[in-house]
Amino acid sequence: MAAGKEIRGKIKSVENTKKITKAMEMVAASKMRKAQERMRAARPYSDKIRNVAANLSQANPEYTHAFMESNDAKATGFIVVTTDKGLCGGLNTNVLRAVTSKLKDLQAAGHDALAVAIGNKGLGFLNRVGAKVVSHATQLGDKPHLEKLIGPVKVLLDAYSEGKINAVYLCYTKFINTMRQEPVVEQLLPLTAAHLQADKDQHGWDYIYEPDAQTVIDDLLLRYVEALIYQAVAENMASEQSARMVAMKAATDNAGSVIGELKLIYNKTRQAAITKELSEIVAGAAAV
């Protein structure tokens, strides 16, 4: 029964793996709910800033912030948001494939690329492909804080304000629902009219701003861009936990199938061994 013993060992091993994947599935489900709550809680903040900035910009059309001006620089910035850990299906692969496609288009046009990596997976990828990583933020944990993002991202924002890069793209995985997440590569800078469009139900504004509207616009647009980046990180984290939960559920289900197949093989092997022993006993009795 050496074969039977080996099969029992495999069954035990797969059962242990199944327990691990089931536990990871439950942990991911809990984290997913919390990540979705953070993602939804961040939206009203960015929406309110956008409305205020939009109304201010419309009231002061003669003033154009640096984030709204285009330039002819031969370099482009990328903020690449990925996960710190794996075991989340093709989440990182899909967004990095989209980044690779965009990088190839820029290289074909003769443009350089400067990147900020948020997450270990993106940092490792950008280093492997030889991209110029100007800063990075990793180990953000389950609760991302804007303070950890501002420093690394500010490098690209300052470069755009100084005319060193012609655009900044935000690359992340957008959360659609628990079963669906989409890789996104969207233009962050320069800000367009679509970015600064007030809600239709907003009433006319007649406020006095101190020290002046221009200073308020400068501060609000920076906060708005930071809020968009934070929202992308929050969406990516919700997508990560959803993808991990689905991946671990699939692994748990597959482990169950493997266990069933191994038990069937074990039973057949055991039955064959018993049949063989009985045949030998009968043959021995017949010989006597």
Curated annotation (Swiss-Prot):
One of its GO terms (cellular component) is plasma membrane. Gene3D superfamilies: 3.40.1380.10, ATP synthase, gamma subunit, helix hairpin domain. The keyword Membrane applies. PROSITE patterns: ATPASE_GAMMA (PS00153). InterPro entries: ATP_synth_F1_ATPase_gsu, ATP_synth_F1_gsu, ATP_synth_F1_gsu_CS. GO terms for molecular function: ATP binding; proton-transporting ATP synthase activity, rotational mechanism. Its main location: membrane. GO terms for biological process: proton motive force-driven plasma membrane ATP synthesis. It is a peripheral membrane protein. It comes from the Bacteria. Keywords: ATP synthesis, Cell inner membrane, Cell membrane, CF(1), Hydrogen ion transport, Ion transport, Membrane, Transport. The keyword Membrane applies. F-type ATPases have 2 components, CF(1) - the catalytic core - and CF(0) - the membrane proton channel. CF(1) has five subunits: alpha(3), beta(3), gamma(1), delta(1), epsilon(1). CF(0) has three main subunits: a, b and c. This is ATP synthase gamma chain. It comes from Polaromonas sp. (strain JS666 / ATCC BAA-500). The gene is atpG.
